[in-house]
A protein has these predicted regions:
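Glycine-biased, small-residue-rich flexible motifs in mid-sequence functional cores and linkers
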Residues: 2, 8, 13-296
């Protein structure tokens, strides 16, 4: 009703099809538990993803824009593994950790969800135009900002409360002190949403905030496998149709690069498929990242 009070009387109002209100059945109920729930959500992309978000069947990933190479690699790897395991990956489409998480999810043919601090008709940063379009094609874009609305610095911090409310777990990959990612972690703790942290270089400024979370009951995340084992398969998990061919291609042992040449599949897809087979006890990863079938 707040949307209607802002935009006109009910008999004259026609709400656009891409605008969600709290009266819609697919409105994510987790948003209503917020102190400041959004008036509306503007969405672009796959509407079916909203059903999973409504049940908080997604994993949020946050971190600094000025990430280290290690942080970027971990974010992309986590996004890839979670996407391959069927988990929608929720982040903010910002520079650094956010973008790496989305790219990893896309590499595994997963479902990325971007909660923007800008209206949907704005791209920030501008060089993320192609990435934003790809996320919309394969997943979902969400924003509480009206089209044409001017962008304020506080909008980016405000969207943190939304991505936490759509997720069943939060991963902080890397962030300094006084980072927006720490706001997300605090909100997650208030909502009893588990917080996982990738341990970072103790001497690097960009890891000080995330490392400090490990002193406050956040769980250390040492590998994506741990998180997938804890969560299980996600809501959009697909049966691994390539499993027999993949196990056969391993032979006595093969790297992902060798499997790429043999099976002509992207590295992200192979990594997520191999992790699924590892969790099922069918393959094992040995030193040197050599994958081998498990002996009967």
């Amino acid at each position: 009703m707040r949307y209607r009070r802002l935009h006109g009387s009910i008999p004259q109002l026609k709400i656009p099809s891409n605008v969600l209100t709290p009266l819609d059945q697919i409105w994510p109920q987790g948003l209503d538990k917020l102190d400041r729930p959004p008036l509306v959500l503007h969405q672009q992309g796959r509407a079916d993803v909203l059903a999973w978000l409504g049940q908080r069947r997604a994993v949020a990933m946050v971190g600094t824009r000025a990430a280290s190479d290690h942080g970027l690699r971990m974010a992309e790897h986590l996004g890839c593994v979670l996407g391959g395991a069927g988990w929608p990956v929720v982040s903010g489409l910002a520079e650094g950790i956010d973008a790496a998480a989305h790219r990893g999810c896309l590499a595994a043919d997963g479902v990325p969800v971007a909660v923007l601090g800008t209206p949907l008709d704005r791209v920030y940063p501008r060089h993320h135009q192609a990435l934003q379009e790809e996320v919309a094609r394969n997943g979902l874009l969400l924003s509480e900002r009206q089209p044409g609305e001017s962008v304020q610095p506080g909008h980016f911090a405000a969207r943190n409360r939304l991505l936490v409310s759509l997720s069943c777990a939060l991963v902080v990959v890397e962030c300094p002190d006084r980072s927006g990612a720490l706001i997300s972690a605090r909100l997650a703790a208030e909502q009893q949403c588990p917080v996982w942290v990738v341990p970072g270089d103790a001497g690097r400024w960009s890891s000080r905030g995330s490392n400090r979370l490990l002193q406050n009951a956040a769980a250390p995340l040492l590998s994506p496998k741990e998180l997938v084992e804890h969560l299980g398969p996600g809501p959009c998990h697909k049966a691994n149709a390539t499993a027999p061919a993949l196990v056969k291609a391993l032979g006595a042992g093969a790297s992902i690069e060798q499997l790429q040449q043999t099976l002509k599949l992207p590295a992200g897809r192979l990594a997520s498929d191999l992790l699924e087979l590892e969790l099922a006890g069918q393959v094992v990863c040995e030193s040197g990242f050599l994958w081998k079938p498990c002996r009967p």
